[in-house]
A protein has these predicted regions:
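Glycine-centered flexibility sites
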Residues: 30, 65-68, 98, 219
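Serine-esterase "nucleophile elbow" of acetyl-processing enzymes
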Residues: 18-66, 81-89
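Short, conserved aromatic-histidine micro-motifs
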Residues: 61-63, 242-245
Length: 245
């Protein structure tokens, strides 16, 4: 009797183990606006560092974004190849570039509009070949106010992302528009709290810092929240794992 009971319990236990699913991996590829930061850079914070807090345990965020990278250099440095080796069916890839692609005076990272488009298509097609889902993000806005009006610094690059998403039927999170709205709603001076503005005397920034591109811890949390909002709006499968806040 006891032997049969133990066998039965073993079968039940094995069934639980069998159905336990491996977490979905949510990769982030991009530049310093999303990247993980070293302690020496604090309080500069990438929005990718805050994204995990918006998802339950069914999703594991793997933030591969890195300072100074563009669609070009992320490929030439083999960083994309490293992701492809582990990318599996059911995973997702958030793709946010543009800040460095637009620096065409730096040939190692800068890309023409056409090259930017070709690189994004490569990311999309190779992600889909792995039966994973690519999600395009336009680059977040810089805090660039002129006479109280926020001005665009990204030239035609965000438009390419939007057009590709539309023509190839790829989920799009329009982070340029989302972050621009937040900045405009806050206004010139109040919006500084979203960015890496540091008073002099800080251990990492002895003479202080005024950075209108990179985020503060608060700004990273706000921007990660906008990404999560975008995931919900796209209605992709990832959305069901968002934590209700």
């Amino acid at each position: 009797m006891y032997k049969n009971l133990l066998v039965g319990l073993g079968v039940i236990l094995m069934s639980f183990i069998a159905v336990k699913k491996e977490p979905i991996t949510l990769y982030i590829i991009g530049d310093s606006t999303a990247a993980n930061k070293q302690p020496k850079s604090f309080p500069e914070t990438g929005w990718g560092m805050e994204l995990q807090s918006f998802f339950d345990t069914n999703v594991k965020v793997d933030n591969r974004a890195l300072n100074g990278r563009s669609t070009k250099s992320f490929i030439t440095e083999k960083r994309w190849d490293a992701i492809l080796t582990s990318l599996k069916e059911g995973d997702f890839v958030l793709i946010e570039f543009g800040h460095n692609d637009e620096k065409i005076d730096k040939p190692e990272i800068g890309t023409s509009i056409n090259e930017f488009k070709s690189n994004l298509i490569k990311y999309i097609q190779e992600t889909q070949a792995k039966k994973a889902t690519p999600v395009l993000l336009t680059p977040i806005a810089r805090r660039n106010f002129k006479n109280g009006v926020l001005t665009n610094t990204h030239k035609g690059y965000p438009a390419i992302v939007r057009k590709l998403a539309d023509s190839l039927h790829i989920p799009l999170i329009d982070m340029e528009r989302k972050t621009s709205k937040v900045l405009m709603d806050l206004g010139d001076e109040p919006s500084k709290k979203l960015f890496n503005y540091v008073d002099s005397g800080h251990v990492n920034y002895p003479i202080g810092k005024k950075d209108d591109t990179h985020l503060s811890p608060y700004g990273a949390k706000v921007v990660a929240g906008l990404v999560a909002e975008g995931v919900k709006e796209t209605k992709i499968g990832l959305a069901k794992y968002l934590i209700k806040k």
